[in-house]
UniProtKB/Swiss-Prot annotation:
Belongs to the MurCDEF family. Its main location: cytoplasm. This is UDP-N-acetylmuramate--L-alanine ligase. Pfam families: Mur_ligase, Mur_ligase_C, Mur_ligase_M. Gene3D superfamilies: Mur ligase, C-terminal domain (3.90.190.20), Mur-like, catalytic domain (3.40.1190.10), NAD(P)-binding Rossmann-like Domain (3.40.50.720). GO terms for biological process: cell division; cell wall organization; peptidoglycan biosynthetic process; regulation of cell shape. The lineage of its organism: Bacteria, Pseudomonadati, Pseudomonadota, Alphaproteobacteria, Candidatus Pelagibacterales. Cell wall formation. One of its GO terms (cellular component) is cytoplasm.
């Protein structure tokens, strides 16, 4: 994907260290744009960008945009950010990440993955299937793919596989040729006033798919299913464990290292087909659904069964999606990004289905006060497949609002509603001490959250 560009434009990314922003910045740099950026803290995403000779400043100050001609902001940037204020004073064009993403993929054949949960894994599975073909797509993902050790890759063809984030509504600007809607859940209510508003935006997005494209909608999800009658055209295929799905998942088998299933395909005007013994090196029915979405797209555009099965079987994974990080005294420790009740429940369901006899311990760090306030009851019900929960302090992500209830009472709600043993820790050192003194033998420990819990998990071997 190559575009001739005005070399005089300097594009500044405010909040360049985020996974979505860093991936977009990398693609634009490799396309030939003059890219720079800033963030308040350094991280691995920024280190990857520096290897591509992208200038990055660790601070937010108006001096950073002195030469910028275009500004791109992440959804995390507040109105009082000095760079955003200066950009407005200078009357520079200011784009949200989703708006800029839409601009750069406007001339490609786009497979756009949307939904509340499962976007990153689904995008990654699609990328793995495509990697076994002669097609060379551009990839823009919300997580780091182990196969390419990055969240983005500039391809040579006119295909683009991208994850579109619904958190600020900007995904509506992305032009889909094919779209996947994994599910719709109560999330980002600080932006959407209601579930009705969220659903209506998804309807608008699906209706943007052209006649020569297709949408793929998981009807295991009730909110997704509710959309079908409200779409303008029946230009979609359904998938899921519902036997009325066009891509019907059946004969599921879950082992400790992989999942296996058959997929019955029933498309209007076409001969029925079954792909048998699909092997996936991921746990959980949620990941079987994610892989089915990828298969549905691949089948529709004509990729062969053998290539599809090979792409899934040889999937290298994506960082922070149930990654095994170390083993200590026969206990396996995993890291996962789950930070919403639905995600926590699905991950634990998958772990329990594969590890029926092992004790499952979940280390949970809530992410954002607002999310915990909004979904307090749902969180308390989401740990039923665990045996033990270790509850960490809330990672506030800079929020300064009041919780509105005692944190100890939330812990009691988890014990009552999920029927687990629960322990609270104050920091990573107390966590390490607890693990050192109490956890050994054949157990599964999963750290969950979108804050610092991943770093805590990776530092545990040095502390225990």
């Amino acid at each position: 994907m190559k575009i001739e560009l005005a070399k005089t434009e300097i594009i500044h990314f405010v909040g360049i260290g985020g996974i979505g922003m860093s991936g977009l910045a990398l693609i634009m740099k490799r396309m030939g744009f003059n890219v720079q950026g800033s963030d308040v803290l350094g991280n691995k995403n920024i280190e990857r960008l520096k290897k591509d000779k992208i200038k990055i400043t660790i601070s937010h100050t108006k001096k950073n945009i002195a030469k910028a001609t275009i500004v791109v902001i992440s959804s995390a940037i507040k109105n009082n950010n000095p760079e955003l204020i200066e950009a407005k004073l200078k009357q520079l064009p200011i784009y949200k990440r989703g708006e800029m993403l839409a601009n750069i993929v406007s001339l490609t054949k786009n497979i756009v993955v949307t939904g509340s949960h499962g976007k990153t894994t689904t995008t990654s599975l699609l990328a793995s299937i495509f990697s076994k073909t002669k097609l060379d797509p551009t990839i823009i993902n919300g997580g780091v793919l182990n196969a390419i050790k990055n969240s983005a890759k500039l391809g040579k063809s006119d295909w683009c596989i991208l994850e579109a984030d619904e958190s600020d509504g900007s995904f509506i600007h992305v032009p889909p040729t094919y779209s996947i809607v994994t599910n719709i859940d109560r999330e980002h209510m600080d932006f959407y006033n209601s579930m009705k508003d969220l659903k209506e935006l998804f309807i608008k997005f699906i209706n943007k798919v052209p006649s020569f494209g297709k949408s793929f909608i998981c009807i295991d999800d009730k909110n997704n299913k509710d959309l079908l009658s409200k779409l303008k055209m029946k230009n979609y295929y359904t998938y899921g464990t519902d036997n009325k799905s066009n891509f019907y998942i059946k004969n599921i088998k879950q082992e400790k290292e992989y999942s296996q299933y058959d997929l019955a395909i029933n498309l209007p005007g076409k001969k029925n087909l079954t792909i048998r013994k699909i092997k996936l090196p991921l746990l959980g029915i949620h990941n079987i659904r994610n892989s089915t979405a990828a298969i549905a797209v691949a089948v529709t555009i004509g990729i062969s069964q053998n290539i599809i099965k090979k792409g899934l079987k040889e999937f290298k994974g994506v960082q922070r999606r149930f990654n095994k990080i170390f083993t200590h005294r026969e206990t396996n420790f995993y890291d996962d990004y789950a930070h919403h009740p639905t995600e926590i429940r699905e991950v634990l369901n998958g772990v329990r289905a594969a590890y029926k006899n092992e004790e499952v311990i979940c280390i949970f760090q809530p992410h954002r006060i607002s999310r915990l306030k909004d979904l307090k009851k749902e969180f308390s019900l989401s740990f039923k497949k665990a045996d033990v929960v270790i509850l960490c302090p809330i990672y506030t992500a800079g929020e300064k609002i009041k919780l509105g209830f005692k944190y100890n009472n939330f812990a009691k709600d988890i014990v009552k509603n999920s029927k687990v043993r629960l322990f609270m820790v104050e920091d990573q050192y107390q966590l390490a001490k607890f693990i050192k003194n109490t956890i050994f033998g054949k157990k599964i420990v999963v750290g969950m959250g979108a804050g610092t819990i991943s770093a805590w998990m990776r530092q545990l071997p040095e502390l225990i």
